[in-house]
A protein has these predicted regions:
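C-terminal peripheral helix-coil segments that are non-catalytic and often amphipathic
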Residues: 1-3, 91, 121, 125, ...
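Basic, helix-initiating cap at the start of DNA-binding domains
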Residues: 1-29, 33-41, 58
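Amphipathic, non-transmembrane alpha-helical scaffold segments
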Residues: 12, 64, 68, 116-124
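Amphipathic alpha-helical interaction segments
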Residues: 18, 37, 58, 87-91, ...
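Short hydrophobic/aromatic patch on the recognition helix
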Residues: 43-53
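Alpha-helical DNA-contacting segments of helix-turn-helix folds
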Residues: 53, 60-67
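Hydrophobic alpha-helical connector segments
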Residues: 62, 73-101, 112-115
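All-alpha amphipathic helical-bundle segments outside canonical DNA-binding/catalytic cores
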Residues: 87, 115-119, 136-152, 168-173
Length: 186
């Protein structure tokens, strides 16, 4: 899609995707990399990058938005409102871990536009819904502060994805996260 909401041609969509993927790789290695370096890594002309993104800030916003769109889709795919809470939580966790490792730089960027903020809020709201449902089902004690539980859960995901041991296989890592979240380490 363009900034005006028009759909891009298939070849233009591929170029944008190649630029975003290259930007993630290049910027993860060198956050000060230029648009020219990103164009080279994407295998496109510098003018193609400038035609698709008005400036570096626009590219960074598109990068973060693309990553958050994938996270939101992964969470939605776990059926947080209808699947049994622990099943939805496990699936969402595995889905997020599979995405997070590929978008380290993008997901570390602040929300710079309304769409990124909306996507983040949708992800957090789905998480809160699953936690509420898990508490109603008795999987989380009645007195637990669910906002705090979400913070702990997100910290576990982040540490798993970016910590020194790496995430490993997403399904096994999700099981490990939920085991620590629900049973502690004691």
């Amino acid at each position: 899609m363009t900034a005006t909401g028009r759909r891009l041609r298939a070849d233009a969509e591929r170029s944008v995707q190649a630029i975003l993927e290259a930007a993630e790789r290049v910027l993860k290695e060198d956050p000060a990399a230029t648009l020219e370096q990103i164009a080279e890594a994407a295998g496109v002309a510098r003018t193609t990058v400038h035609r698709r993104f008005a400036n570096r800030d626009a590219l960074l916003a598109a990068l973060a938005e693309s990553a958050w769109r994938q996270i939101a889709g992964a969470v939605e795919g776990a059926r947080p409102a209808t699947a049994p809470p622990l099943v939805a939580l496990h699936q969402a966790t595995a889905n997020i871990l599979a995405i997070k490792s590929g978008w380290t730089f993008a997901l570390g960027q602040p929300a710079t536009n309304e769409e990124i903020g909306r996507l983040q809020q949708a992800v957090y709201a789905a998480c809160d819904e699953v936690f509420r449902r898990a508490q109603q089902a008795g999987d989380i004690r009645a007195g637990v502060d669910l906002a705090w539980a979400r913070q702990v859960y997100l910290a576990l995901i982040n540490e798993t994805a970016h910590g020194p041991t790496g995430g490993g296989e997403p399904d096994a890592a999700a099981a490990r996260i939920l085991d620590v979240l629900f049973h502690g380490i004691g």
